[in-house]
Amino acid sequence: MGFVDGFSAFLHSSGAVKFGDFELSGGGRSPYYFDLRSVPSHPHQFRGMIRGLLDSVISEVGLDRFDTLASIPTGGLVVASALAIEAVKPLVYARAAAKGHGTGRTVEGIVRYGARALIIDDVATTGGSVIRAAESLRAAGAIVTDAFVVIDRMEGAEGRLGAEGIKLHRLAGALEVARSLHAAGLIPGDVMRQVEGRTR
């Protein structure tokens, strides 16, 4: 069994991927929903996910091609924190908005001018949160050319990020997960076709 097949089966059995009718944070509705916030409650599978992510980062980007990991609270920060430990890389995170107190920074952590930052998030839908993080990081002097997500819902994030000069990488795509689950007999064909109808 390949990584995506095993990971997909775990997402399904743990309830981290659900099929039905869900409202997304952007206001739209979807026949499927990924909630990776529950994955750290399963330490063995969480470790496997982080190791799979590290292997993908090494093969697709290269540890020598970035200086720091940068994440987006809250879902992505848990993933990036574990990945930073495994990769032995510094970690910063970009807020959606500056705090109204303290330093008022939008980026927390040390960002050296000219540092190459690899953005890490849990799930990408349209790419909006990654774009906002990249804007904050670039304003702080970082260079952002790549972003890595655990799950790409495949609903336009890749194209939007590409227009911003950011290549999107993923551990798995929504369609890969659905096809794997269908092949394993865990979801019916009509559910898989609903996913196929939304992804691009």
Swiss-Prot record:
EC number assigned by the record: 2.4.2.10
SUPFAM superfamilies to which the protein is assigned, alphabetical: PRTase-like
BP-aspect Gene Ontology terms: 'de novo' UMP biosynthetic process; pyrimidine nucleobase biosynthetic process
Top-level lineage group: Archaea
Keyword rRNA-binding: no
Reactions listed under catalytic activity: orotidine 5'-phosphate + diphosphate = orotate + 5-phospho-alpha-D-ribose 1-diphosphate
Associated pathway: Pyrimidine metabolism; UMP biosynthesis via de novo pathway; UMP from orotate: step 1/2
Keywords: Glycosyltransferase, Magnesium, Pyrimidine biosynthesis, Transferase
Protein's job: Catalyzes the transfer of a ribosyl phosphate group from 5-phosphoribose 1-diphosphate to orotate, leading to the formation of orotidine monophosphate (OMP).
NCBIfam families (alphabetical): pyrE (TIGR00336)
Protein name, per record: Orotate phosphoribosyltransferase
Taxonomic source organism: Cenarchaeum symbiosum (strain A)
